[in-house]
Amino acid sequence: MEHYISLLVKSIFIENMALSFFLGMCTFLAVSKKVKTSFGLGVAVVVVLTIAVPVNNLVYTYLLKENALVAGVDLTFLSFITFIGVIAALVQILEMILDRFFPPLYNALGIFLPLITVNCAIFGGVSFMVQRDYNFAESVVYGFGSGIGWMLAIVALAGIREKMKYSDVPPGLRGLGITFITVGLMALGFMSFSGVQL
């Protein structure tokens, strides 16, 4: 149990997808103007990562890995396209659920909801799972923790950006300029966790 708690804390803080690996930056910067919208997208990313990483773990382990289906056959060259297909299917299902049950959130996310399909954080989570050879339980914990970490980062950035509306930002830095500086400072803050040994 201690191993899984360690993996969860590590994936949220020490190896944060947004602030340590800078994955998923396009939606991270574009949707982080309001806390409510950022929280909605963060929840969507948590759901997709929590499901996509373990599902792709099963696909990789039982279909693509060497000797998985047939002895002597290695289908790992199909990994990327298979992972993207699974992620795309999960995002489509999530999009239909949000459209049906949460129309305001669906409309607020707009084009960024389908873009979760090609969000680097989602694909990065799946790729790290394969690279680190996580088992199914570890991949569930890692997917959930990575999603929570990404959501934490985007909601924190949105809160800071909402407060900065009332700040006296120099004209040359207004908009994305000050946002990049803010993200850099947040990343420095998260770097302080890098020395933590779990």
UniProtKB/Swiss-Prot annotation:
Sorted UniProt keywords: Cell inner membrane, Cell membrane, Ion transport, Membrane, NAD, Sodium, Sodium transport, Translocase, Transmembrane, Transmembrane helix, Transport, Ubiquinone
NCBIfam families: nqrE (TIGR01940)
Positions of transmembrane segments: 11-31, 39-59, 77-97, 110-130, 140-160, 176-196
Family: Belongs to the NqrDE/RnfAE family.
Native organism: Aliivibrio fischeri (strain ATCC 700601 / ES114)
Function: NQR complex catalyzes the reduction of ubiquinone-1 to ubiquinol by two successive reactions, coupled with the transport of Na(+) ions from the cytoplasm to the periplasm. NqrA to NqrE are probably involved in the second step, the conversion of ubisemiquinone to ubiquinol.
Pfam family, one: Rnf-Nqr
GO biological processes: respiratory electron transport chain; sodium ion transport
Catalysed transformations (reactions): a ubiquinone + n Na(+)(in) + NADH + H(+) = a ubiquinol + n Na(+)(out) + NAD(+)
GO cellular component, one term: Gram-negative-bacterium-type cell wall
Family matches, as PANTHER family: INTEGRAL MEMBRANE PROTEIN OF SOXR-REDUCING COMPLEX (PTHR30335), NA(+)-TRANSLOCATING NADH-QUINONE REDUCTASE SUBUNIT E (PTHR30335:SF1)
Primary localization: membrane
Subunit relationships: Composed of six subunits; NqrA, NqrB, NqrC, NqrD, NqrE and NqrF.
A molecular function (GO) term: oxidoreductase activity, acting on NAD(P)H, quinone or similar compound as acceptor
HAMAP family: NqrE
Location of this chain's protein in the cell: Cell inner membrane
EC number: 7.2.1.1
Name of this chain's protein: Na(+)-translocating NADH-quinone reductase subunit E
Domain of life per record: Bacteria
Enzyme class: translocase
Membrane topology: Multi-pass membrane protein
